[in-house]
């Protein structure tokens, strides 16, 4: 039973980026990140974006992103994630699981031709 849940929609310009945090049955805080918005959601030349600060906060608290969900590869959904992966080499130790909606991967899974 989840006792406490927070859902935050990050400032992502025209994109989407959502962080869901909750306390699981064992009292551990879990984090789910859905998409990463545009590249500027993580950082730009002039400033760090909201995604950057959310990730730093999670790391500083000794937590992880238990699940990263990438809904599709449009830049307004994946750009911030790509920027994060380029700039922060800790990502592989922070992200525990990834769900990626890829037509190619789904087609390979079902051994069907990819629908263009």
Segments (PLM) and residue ranges:
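Flexible, acidic/histidine-containing loops and adjacent segments that form or flank the divalent-metal
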Residues: 1-5, 82-116
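Conserved beta-strand hairpin/beta-sheet module of binuclear metal-dependent hydrolase folds
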Residues: 2-61
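Active-site environment of divalent metal-dependent phosphoester hydrolases
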Residues: 14, 73-79, 105-107
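Active-site metal-binding motif and surrounding structural segment of the metallo-beta-lactamase
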Residues: 29, 47-98
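Active-site metal-binding loops of divalent metal-dependent hydrolases
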Residues: 35-39, 73, 103
